[in-house]
Amino acid sequence: MLNEAAGARRIDVLDEVTPTMAEDVLRLVAEAARTDGQQAVSEQGRLQLRGRREGVRHLLLTEEPSGKLVGYAQLEDTDPVEAPAAELVVHPAHRGQGHGRALGVTLLRESGKRLRVWAHGGHSSARHLAQVLGLTLFRELRQMRRPLGPPATLDIPEPVLPEGVTVRTFRPGEDEAAWLAANAAAFAHHPEQGSLTLRDLEDRMGEPWFDPEGFFLAERGGEIVGFHWTKVHAQERLGEVYVVGVRPEAQGGGLGRSLTAIGLRHLAGRGLPTAMLYVDADNFPAVAVYGRQGFTTYETDLMYRTET
């Protein structure tokens, strides 16, 4: 634990937060989202508030002497190659007072001045903070959306599976290890997704939105060769192409396209009017494929980093 007091604020750097602290952080994130229109801390970041996580540190900024939590940042140093990654948020009613910069400076120090920072939604205040901290833009993550309701439903192609491939839904308690292996193979080039652990999977399976009937597995010869995990955002009435993956040896035969169609048909069958997904802007083949499937860019998350 590291304490840093400066003027009317204090920043605590913790390896683990208590359940009460976690509730306070989630409340702060939700209040900021109502103003910003988007969560400043990702799903993974919110899940990492539960108990101690290797390589994860929490920065809690409180105003003194009240002790009110008005800022939060999370630093994850688990990538063996890339610099530590961070997300941060300041309560809307307490912005413009240097809290964001104070969190950013602390993140730089804690990361050894090797840092990547997400700016979800690419808000102007986040871009300004990145500039103040001397960070440069290096990654753009697009959120793309498409309609699902009639007549758009008719545009979802009929799935055509490669020879020998069958599709079924995920069986909790049976498929975890096999899916993790398939996920690691499919995303060997993508450490954020490919490094998911059993704990990460179980965290998501414990969420209210988890539905095995929307988690599709493609098998050939008893082995998982591809998958499409969908997610329903009930409050927003939004269906998500949460993750689509195909093992390298099964790529190139249209399996990913067919799995995407299966998931979209499932989401449309749930009566959801819109589907969304995330894709890196520089993944031109994927952006093109999703564009042909009716997706258009809705908003963009930006990642900044220190010069390397």
Curated annotation (Swiss-Prot):
Record keywords: Acyltransferase, Repeat, Transferase
Pfam families: Acetyltransf_1 (PF00583), Acetyltransf_7 (PF13508)
Annotated residues for binding of acetyl-CoA 2: V244, G245, V246, Q251, G252, G253, G254, L255, G256, R257
Gene Ontology biological process terms from the UniProt entry: mycothiol biosynthetic process
Record bears the keyword Nucleotidyltransferase: no
Secreted found in the keyword field: no
GO MF terms held by the record: mycothiol synthase activity
Chain coiled-coil ranges: none
Record: residues binding 1D-myo-inositol 2-(L-cysteinylamino)-2-deoxy-alpha-D-glucopyranoside: E43, E192, K231, E240, Y278
Catalytic reaction equation(s): 1D-myo-inositol 2-(L-cysteinylamino)-2-deoxy-alpha-D-glucopyranoside + acetyl-CoA = mycothiol + CoA + H(+)
Residues noted as binding acetyl-CoA 1 in the record, renumbered to the chain: L88, V89, V90
E.C. designation(s): 2.3.1.189
N-acetyltransferase domain segment(s): 12-149, 165-308
Its job: Catalyzes the transfer of acetyl from acetyl-CoA to desacetylmycothiol (Cys-GlcN-Ins) to form mycothiol.
Subunit note: Monomer.
NCBIfam families, alphabetized: mycothiol_MshD
Similarity-based family: Belongs to the acetyltransferase family. MshD subfamily.
Annotated protein name in UniProt: Mycothiol acetyltransferase
Gene: mshD
